[in-house]
């Protein structure tokens, strides 16, 4: 029987790094569900198709191959902007959630991270984590990341973008971002990834022994 770990949280809270570390440690399959929305958006952009046509976007979502998700390519800013436009479409969410649910059934276990894993995709997951941090800390991390990659960052613009993204994710009518009632809260504002990982590991190990 498979063991699923559901990890949710806002942008730049550290859930992606934490999820990959957990999956590697336990030998589980990992899926960053945000990449499924980005890949769908990229397919539309590559085909020169509009981002406001739900039927076309749904068709692309249904044809998505989860094995072909390239984080480096899909991390581009313009793809993220396009993804945020299709992520609010109910038919697109429905198609991608179905694919994500199938992924979650892989043996021996899976780690899925996103915005609605513990509430919608895997509501019965034995471990649910909600990874968060203050908007200021998350904007600072994103700013530092851009500088580290040789880019030019505007902290105020990044902070405004983080706040706008939060409002969009939490105010969405379909599957808004919120912690599952039985999720363990990990606030990484003043916590290193290693400390967050050790806290998560304690929770996971306890669940595996049940």
Curated annotation (Swiss-Prot):
Reactions catalysed, as given in the entry: CMP + ATP = CDP + ADP; dCMP + ATP = dCDP + ADP
Presence of keyword Transmembrane helix: no
InterPro entries referenced in this protein's UniProt entry, alphabetically: Cytidylate_kin, Cytidylate_kinase_dom, P-loop_NTPase
Binding site for ATP: 9-17
Any single GO BP term: pyrimidine nucleotide metabolic process
Pfam families on file: Cytidylate_kin (PF02224)
Localization (cell): Cytoplasm
tRNA processing is among the record's keywords: no
Similarity annotation: Belongs to the cytidylate kinase family. Type 1 subfamily.
Top-level lineage group: Bacteria
Enzyme class: transferase
Listed name of the protein: Cytidylate kinase
Entries under NCBIfam families matching the protein: cmk
Keyword set, alphabetical order: ATP-binding, Cytoplasm, Kinase, Nucleotide-binding, Transferase
SUPFAM superfamilies: P-loop containing nucleoside triphosphate hydrolases (SSF52540)
GO molecular function, one term: dCMP kinase activity
Gene designation: cmk
EC number: 2.7.4.25
Entry's Gene Ontology cellular component terms: cytoplasm
């Amino acid at each position: 029987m498979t063991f699923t770990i559901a990890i949710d949280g806002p942008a730049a809270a550290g859930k992606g790094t934490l999820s990959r570390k957990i999956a590697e440690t336990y030998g589980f399959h990992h899926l960053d569900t945000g990449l499924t929305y980005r890949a769908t958006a990229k397919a539309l952009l590559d085909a020169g198709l509009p981002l406001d046509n739900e039927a076309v976007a749904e068709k692309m979502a249904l044809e998505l191959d989860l094995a072909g998700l390239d984080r480096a390519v899909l991390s581009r800013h313009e793809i993220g902007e396009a993804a945020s436009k299709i992520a609010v479409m109910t038919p697109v969410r429905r198609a991608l959630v179905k694919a994500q649910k199938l992924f979650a059934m892989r043996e021996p276990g899976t780690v899925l991270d996103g915005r609605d894993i513990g509430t919608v995709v895997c509501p019965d997951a034995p471990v649910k984590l909600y990874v968060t941090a203050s908007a200021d800390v998350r904007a600072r991390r994103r700013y530092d990341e851009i500088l580290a990659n040789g880019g030019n960052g505007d902290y105020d613009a990044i902070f405004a973008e983080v706040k706008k993204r939060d409002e969009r994710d939490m105010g969405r009518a379909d599957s808004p971002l919120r912690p599952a009632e039985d999720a363990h809260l990990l606030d990484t504002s003043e916590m290193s990834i290693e400390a967050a990982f050790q806290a998560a590991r304690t929770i996971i190990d306890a669940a595996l022994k049940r």
